[in-house]
């Protein structure tokens, strides 16, 4: 489908590639603020994304910059996912929470074959646990390794701790086995850990990271309460929810293969519906349209969406934008 504006010649469409989502969301936030300083109301701006999983980083960045926003859709809280809670339980244990309820969340994730019967006190004491397995040297080795791992975690920065839990302790292996037993895709579970690790990067201490999570949770609660109230600030919404609305400035977030079109859309009718949603998203912009995609996500190379290529806005291969530089207009 060829797309033509009906308001005469206006501003060019800006298509940009960013190194990663952190750079992408930082740029969007700064540009929204700049548009506001130019006299455009926040209510006349929108950021659109394919699914409600998309805006977490952007929400966190907008909170940091104190840019008002409202969400049309409910956004799941990454920090309340059961996988995230498992990671937090490791950190809580490293910081001294040896309550039975906390230790039960981690003791066999990954499998250490430690019986619940061995954890029969409200607060777990490692010496008592060793006594329970005193005639099984291989179990004593596992207990000692866990104690060592918790001591290591205590001194780490949050992002390093998440990586240590995944790779050194073996939580990724646990998730892989969990997924295989249930015929799930391990990659879908790893995405939660990737997002969690990405979230931890800006913070040097657990306290700062946990404080940020509390603020994020409160913001989601506030957005939920205000969803039916008067809409103030930048609109954040899925492509599906934006139909019928128009804004002076529109950003389309994460226009990469696997996101738009969604990786689950494989049949031609599904792909056509994805294409239609992308078209709807583009046509929400009255004055300025920005289409953003990333080069790398979670240390994996990404490809620009076929829908962006189909628009012809990328031009020749040599015209592709790199690292946030402006490409063809």
Language model features by range: what are they?
Residues 85-89, 234-262:
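A short beta-strand element within the Helicase C-terminal
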Residues 123, 256-329:
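C-terminal accessory regions
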Residues 9-13, 43, 65-67, 232, ...:
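Short glycine-/polar-rich loops that comprise or flank the Walker A/P-loop
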Residues 11, 64-67, 75-110:
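Conserved short internal alpha-helix adjacent to the catalytic or cofactor-binding core
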Residues 134-241, 259-262, 288, 321-329:
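Accessory C-terminal helicase-associated subdomains
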């Amino acid at each position: 489908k060829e797309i033509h504006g009906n308001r005469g010649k206006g501003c060019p469409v800006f298509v940009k590639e960013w190194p990663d989502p952190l750079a992408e969301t930082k740029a969007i936030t700064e540009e929204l603020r700049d548009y506001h300083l130019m006299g455009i109301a926040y209510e006349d701006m929108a950021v659109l994304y394919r699914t409600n999983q998309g805006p977490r980083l952007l929400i966190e960045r907008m909170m940091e910059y104190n840019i008002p926003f409202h969400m049309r859709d409910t956004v799941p809280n990454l920090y309340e996912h059961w996988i995230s809670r498992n990671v937090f339980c490791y950190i809580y244990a490293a910081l001294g929470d040896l309550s039975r309820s906390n230790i039960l969340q981690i003791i066999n994730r990954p499998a250490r074959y430690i019986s619940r019967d061995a954890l029969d006190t409200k607060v777990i004491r490692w010496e008592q646990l060793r006594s329970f397995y005193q005639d099984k040297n291989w179990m004593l080795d596992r207990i000692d390794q866990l104690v060592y791992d918790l001591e290591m975690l205590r001194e780490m920065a949050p992002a390093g701790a998440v990586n240590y839990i995944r790779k050194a302790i073996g939580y990724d292996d646990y998730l892989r086995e969990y997924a295989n037993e249930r015929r799930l895709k391990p990659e879908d579970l790893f995405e939660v850990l990737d997002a969690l690790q990405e979230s931890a990067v800006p913070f040097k201490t657990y306290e700062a990271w946990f404080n940020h999570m509390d603020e994020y949770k409160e913001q989601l609660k506030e957005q939920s309460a205000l969803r039916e109230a008067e809409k103030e600030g930048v609109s954040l919404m899925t492509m599906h929810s934006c139909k019928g609305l128009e804004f002076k400035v529109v950003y389309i977030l994460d226009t990469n293969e696997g996101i738009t079109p969604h990786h689950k859309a494989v049949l031609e009718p599904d792909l056509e519906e994805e294409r239609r949603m992308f078209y709807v998203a583009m046509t929400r912009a009255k004055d300025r349209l920005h289409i953003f995609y990333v080069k790398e996500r979670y240390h994996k190379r990404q490809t620009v969406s076929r829908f962006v290529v189909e628009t012809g806005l990328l031009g020749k291969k040599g015209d592709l934008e790199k690292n946030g530089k402006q490409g063809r207009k």
